[in-house]
Amino acid sequence: MSALKKLLAAALISTVLSFCSFGPTLEKDESARAIFDAENDQVILPLDAYNTDGKDEYFTKALELARKKCFAEHGQHYKMFVRTEGAGRNFGRTYGIWNVEYAQKYGLHKSDDSNTLDLSSPAPSSDPGKDVSTECYQRASDEMKQIGEIPFGSATYRRLETDARNAAGDQQLKKSLDDEWKRCVKDKGLTPDSEVTVKESKNIPQSATPSEEEIRIAVIQAQCNQDVGRSQKLYDLEAQYQKPLVAKNQAALENELKEFKRRDEQFKQYVLDNQ
Protein backbone atom coordinates (compact mmCIF):
# COMPACT_ATOMS: atom_id res chain seq x y z
CA MET A 1 0.00 0.00 0.00
CA SER A 2 1.36 3.42 -0.96
CA ALA A 3 1.97 6.11 1.63
CA LEU A 4 -0.94 8.14 0.23
CA LYS A 5 -3.35 5.19 0.50
CA LYS A 6 -2.22 4.52 4.06
CA LEU A 7 -2.81 8.16 4.94
CA LEU A 8 -6.30 8.12 3.41
CA ALA A 9 -7.16 4.85 5.19
CA ALA A 10 -6.01 6.26 8.52
CA ALA A 11 -8.09 9.39 7.97
CA LEU A 12 -11.16 7.29 7.16
CA ILE A 13 -10.73 5.13 10.28
CA SER A 14 -10.27 8.24 12.40
CA THR A 15 -13.47 9.75 11.02
CA VAL A 16 -15.48 6.56 11.68
CA LEU A 17 -14.14 6.23 15.22
CA SER A 18 -14.87 9.86 15.89
CA PHE A 19 -18.45 9.43 14.74
CA CYS A 20 -18.92 6.28 16.84
CA SER A 21 -17.48 7.95 19.91
CA PHE A 22 -19.52 11.11 19.87
CA GLY A 23 -22.54 10.22 17.74
CA PRO A 24 -24.58 12.68 15.68
CA THR A 25 -24.55 16.31 16.74
CA LEU A 26 -27.96 17.42 18.02
CA GLU A 27 -29.47 20.88 17.77
CA LYS A 28 -29.03 22.96 20.91
CA ASP A 29 -31.18 25.80 22.26
CA GLU A 30 -28.95 27.96 24.44
CA SER A 31 -31.98 29.74 25.92
CA ALA A 32 -33.42 26.58 27.53
CA ARG A 33 -33.09 26.19 31.29
CA ALA A 34 -33.93 23.45 33.77
CA ILE A 35 -36.51 24.47 36.38
CA PHE A 36 -35.42 23.83 39.96
CA ASP A 37 -38.49 23.29 42.16
CA ALA A 38 -36.96 23.69 45.61
CA GLU A 39 -40.24 23.13 47.47
CA ASN A 40 -40.71 19.65 46.00
CA ASP A 41 -36.99 18.93 45.50
CA GLN A 42 -37.46 18.28 41.79
CA VAL A 43 -35.71 19.33 38.61
CA ILE A 44 -38.07 19.79 35.66
CA LEU A 45 -36.79 19.40 32.09
CA PRO A 46 -38.63 20.03 28.79
CA LEU A 47 -39.29 16.31 28.18
CA ASP A 48 -40.86 15.79 31.60
CA ALA A 49 -44.29 16.78 30.29
CA TYR A 50 -44.27 13.45 28.43
CA ASN A 51 -42.82 11.27 31.19
CA THR A 52 -45.52 8.84 32.32
CA ASP A 53 -43.58 7.32 35.24
CA GLY A 54 -45.94 7.26 38.20
CA LYS A 55 -48.70 9.08 36.33
CA ASP A 56 -51.23 6.33 35.72
CA GLU A 57 -54.49 7.24 37.44
CA TYR A 58 -56.26 3.87 37.50
CA PHE A 59 -54.04 0.91 36.54
CA THR A 60 -51.84 0.77 39.67
CA LYS A 61 -54.85 1.23 41.94
CA ALA A 62 -56.77 -1.51 40.11
CA LEU A 63 -53.82 -3.88 40.43
CA GLU A 64 -53.51 -3.16 44.15
CA LEU A 65 -57.26 -3.63 44.69
CA ALA A 66 -57.08 -7.02 42.94
CA ARG A 67 -54.20 -8.07 45.18
CA LYS A 68 -56.02 -6.89 48.29
CA LYS A 69 -59.16 -8.82 47.31
CA CYS A 70 -57.16 -12.02 46.81
CA PHE A 71 -55.38 -11.67 50.16
CA ALA A 72 -58.74 -11.09 51.86
CA GLU A 73 -60.05 -14.34 50.38
CA HIS A 74 -57.22 -16.08 52.23
CA GLY A 75 -58.05 -14.22 55.45
CA GLN A 76 -54.96 -12.01 55.25
CA HIS A 77 -54.41 -8.26 55.28
CA TYR A 78 -52.73 -6.52 52.36
CA LYS A 79 -51.57 -2.92 52.78
CA MET A 80 -52.01 -1.20 49.45
CA PHE A 81 -49.39 0.89 47.73
CA VAL A 82 -50.62 4.48 47.42
CA ARG A 83 -48.89 6.34 44.63
CA THR A 84 -48.08 10.01 45.15
CA GLU A 85 -47.76 12.68 42.47
CA GLY A 86 -44.65 12.06 40.44
CA ALA A 87 -43.70 8.85 42.24
CA GLY A 88 -41.21 6.82 40.25
CA ARG A 89 -39.67 9.82 38.55
CA ASN A 90 -36.11 10.97 38.71
CA PHE A 91 -36.33 13.74 41.29
CA GLY A 92 -33.22 15.53 40.14
CA ARG A 93 -30.33 14.03 42.07
CA THR A 94 -28.38 12.73 39.10
CA TYR A 95 -25.66 15.27 39.87
CA GLY A 96 -25.94 15.13 43.65
CA ILE A 97 -27.89 16.91 46.38
CA TRP A 98 -28.48 20.57 45.43
CA ASN A 99 -31.42 21.73 47.56
CA VAL A 100 -30.06 23.39 50.71
CA GLU A 101 -33.48 24.11 52.23
CA TYR A 102 -34.61 20.52 51.71
CA ALA A 103 -31.36 19.18 53.16
CA GLN A 104 -31.94 21.30 56.28
CA LYS A 105 -35.30 19.56 56.78
CA TYR A 106 -34.71 16.00 55.61
CA GLY A 107 -30.96 15.46 55.58
CA LEU A 108 -29.60 13.08 52.96
CA HIS A 109 -32.81 11.22 52.16
CA LYS A 110 -36.04 12.03 50.41
CA SER A 111 -39.26 12.47 52.33
CA ASP A 112 -41.52 9.55 51.35
CA ASP A 113 -44.16 9.64 54.07
CA SER A 114 -47.05 9.81 51.58
CA ASN A 115 -46.21 6.53 49.82
CA THR A 116 -47.19 3.37 51.65
CA LEU A 117 -46.18 -0.10 50.60
CA ASP A 118 -46.12 -3.05 52.97
CA LEU A 119 -43.18 -5.18 51.88
CA SER A 120 -43.32 -7.51 54.89
CA SER A 121 -43.91 -11.21 54.31
CA PRO A 122 -47.59 -12.19 54.61
CA ALA A 123 -48.70 -14.51 57.36
CA PRO A 124 -48.64 -18.24 56.51
CA SER A 125 -51.68 -19.47 54.61
CA SER A 126 -54.15 -21.86 56.21
CA ASP A 127 -52.97 -24.20 53.48
CA PRO A 128 -49.27 -24.88 54.27
CA GLY A 129 -48.59 -25.85 50.67
CA LYS A 130 -49.82 -22.56 49.24
CA ASP A 131 -47.77 -19.37 48.83
CA VAL A 132 -50.47 -16.70 49.12
CA SER A 133 -48.23 -13.86 48.04
CA THR A 134 -47.15 -15.56 44.81
CA GLU A 135 -50.69 -16.70 44.02
CA CYS A 136 -52.28 -13.29 44.61
CA TYR A 137 -49.69 -11.33 42.68
CA GLN A 138 -50.11 -13.66 39.70
CA ARG A 139 -53.90 -13.67 39.92
CA ALA A 140 -54.03 -9.88 40.05
CA SER A 141 -51.70 -9.59 37.07
CA ASP A 142 -53.79 -12.05 35.04
CA GLU A 143 -56.98 -10.20 35.97
CA MET A 144 -55.54 -6.91 34.72
CA LYS A 145 -54.58 -8.47 31.38
CA GLN A 146 -58.19 -9.62 30.93
CA ILE A 147 -59.45 -6.06 31.47
CA GLY A 148 -57.25 -4.30 28.95
CA GLU A 149 -53.82 -3.38 27.65
CA ILE A 150 -51.26 -2.45 30.30
CA PRO A 151 -50.26 1.24 30.03
CA PHE A 152 -46.57 1.52 29.22
CA GLY A 153 -44.37 4.60 29.00
CA SER A 154 -43.50 6.39 25.79
CA ALA A 155 -40.76 4.78 23.71
CA THR A 156 -40.18 8.13 22.00
CA TYR A 157 -39.70 9.83 25.36
CA ARG A 158 -37.12 7.24 26.43
CA ARG A 159 -35.20 7.54 23.17
CA LEU A 160 -35.12 11.34 23.22
CA GLU A 161 -34.14 11.45 26.89
CA THR A 162 -31.20 9.14 26.15
CA ASP A 163 -30.19 11.12 23.05
CA ALA A 164 -30.24 14.41 24.94
CA ARG A 165 -28.29 13.03 27.89
CA ASN A 166 -25.66 11.53 25.58
CA ALA A 167 -25.36 14.79 23.67
CA ALA A 168 -25.03 16.69 26.94
CA GLY A 169 -22.32 14.32 28.17
CA ASP A 170 -19.56 16.93 28.19
CA GLN A 171 -17.08 14.92 30.24
CA GLN A 172 -14.62 17.79 30.43
CA LEU A 173 -17.24 20.12 31.92
CA LYS A 174 -18.55 17.45 34.29
CA LYS A 175 -15.06 16.53 35.51
CA SER A 176 -14.26 20.19 36.11
CA LEU A 177 -17.46 20.67 38.14
CA ASP A 178 -16.93 17.38 40.01
CA ASP A 179 -13.41 18.44 40.97
CA GLU A 180 -14.64 21.84 42.16
CA TRP A 181 -17.34 20.18 44.27
CA LYS A 182 -14.83 17.76 45.81
CA ARG A 183 -12.54 20.64 46.74
CA CYS A 184 -15.45 22.52 48.28
CA VAL A 185 -16.65 19.67 50.53
CA LYS A 186 -13.05 18.84 51.46
CA ASP A 187 -12.46 22.46 52.51
CA LYS A 188 -15.51 22.13 54.77
CA GLY A 189 -14.12 19.04 56.52
CA LEU A 190 -15.70 16.18 54.55
CA THR A 191 -14.02 13.40 52.58
CA PRO A 192 -15.35 12.97 49.01
CA ASP A 193 -15.39 9.33 47.91
CA SER A 194 -17.24 9.77 44.59
CA GLU A 195 -18.57 12.55 42.38
CA VAL A 196 -21.73 12.87 44.50
CA THR A 197 -21.04 11.32 47.92
CA VAL A 198 -18.77 11.71 50.92
CA LYS A 199 -17.28 9.06 53.18
CA GLU A 200 -18.95 10.48 56.29
CA SER A 201 -22.44 9.75 54.90
CA LYS A 202 -21.86 5.99 54.69
CA ASN A 203 -22.52 5.37 58.38
CA ILE A 204 -25.64 7.54 58.59
CA PRO A 205 -28.72 5.29 59.05
CA GLN A 206 -31.90 6.25 57.21
CA SER A 207 -34.61 7.28 59.64
CA ALA A 208 -37.81 9.30 59.71
CA THR A 209 -36.06 12.02 61.70
CA PRO A 210 -32.56 12.96 60.48
CA SER A 211 -29.83 13.51 63.05
CA GLU A 212 -27.95 16.80 63.40
CA GLU A 213 -24.89 15.13 61.86
CA GLU A 214 -26.86 13.91 58.85
CA ILE A 215 -28.28 17.39 58.29
CA ARG A 216 -24.82 18.95 58.61
CA ILE A 217 -23.35 16.60 56.00
CA ALA A 218 -26.31 17.03 53.63
CA VAL A 219 -26.25 20.83 53.85
CA ILE A 220 -22.52 20.98 53.09
CA GLN A 221 -22.97 18.78 50.02
CA ALA A 222 -25.96 20.79 48.77
CA GLN A 223 -24.33 24.16 49.44
CA CYS A 224 -21.17 23.15 47.59
CA ASN A 225 -23.31 21.93 44.68
CA GLN A 226 -24.98 25.35 44.51
CA ASP A 227 -21.73 27.27 44.97
CA VAL A 228 -20.09 25.35 42.12
CA GLY A 229 -23.28 25.38 40.03
CA ARG A 230 -22.89 21.72 39.17
CA SER A 231 -26.53 20.59 38.99
CA GLN A 232 -27.61 23.91 37.47
CA LYS A 233 -25.06 23.80 34.64
CA LEU A 234 -25.40 20.10 33.83
CA TYR A 235 -29.21 20.02 33.93
CA ASP A 236 -29.34 23.24 31.87
CA LEU A 237 -27.19 21.49 29.28
CA GLU A 238 -29.66 18.58 29.13
CA ALA A 239 -32.55 21.05 28.78
CA GLN A 240 -30.80 22.81 25.90
CA TYR A 241 -30.65 19.55 23.94
CA GLN A 242 -34.12 18.39 25.00
CA LYS A 243 -36.05 21.49 23.92
CA PRO A 244 -35.37 21.17 20.14
CA LEU A 245 -36.00 17.41 20.33
CA VAL A 246 -39.42 18.03 21.90
CA ALA A 247 -40.31 20.50 19.14
CA LYS A 248 -39.28 18.08 16.38
CA ASN A 249 -41.02 15.04 17.90
CA GLN A 250 -44.06 16.67 19.49
CA ALA A 251 -46.64 14.76 17.42
CA ALA A 252 -45.19 11.36 18.37
CA LEU A 253 -44.85 12.38 22.02
CA GLU A 254 -48.46 13.63 22.15
CA ASN A 255 -49.80 10.48 20.46
CA GLU A 256 -47.97 8.14 22.84
CA LEU A 257 -49.16 10.16 25.84
CA LYS A 258 -52.76 9.89 24.59
CA GLU A 259 -52.33 6.13 24.11
CA PHE A 260 -51.00 5.80 27.67
CA LYS A 261 -54.05 7.64 29.03
CA ARG A 262 -56.42 5.58 26.85
CA ARG A 263 -55.01 2.33 28.20
CA ASP A 264 -55.10 3.61 31.77
CA GLU A 265 -58.76 4.62 31.39
CA GLN A 266 -59.69 0.96 30.73
CA PHE A 267 -59.13 0.21 34.42
CA LYS A 268 -61.35 3.02 35.74
CA GLN A 269 -64.51 0.91 36.05
CA TYR A 270 -62.67 -1.83 37.96
CA VAL A 271 -61.47 0.77 40.47
CA LEU A 272 -64.98 2.21 40.86
CA ASP A 273 -66.48 -1.27 41.36
CA ASN A 274 -63.91 -2.50 43.89
CA GLN A 275 -62.68 0.41 46.00
Question: Which residues are covered by each model-predicted region?
Answer:
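Bacterial N-terminal signal peptides that target proteins for export
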Residues: 1-8
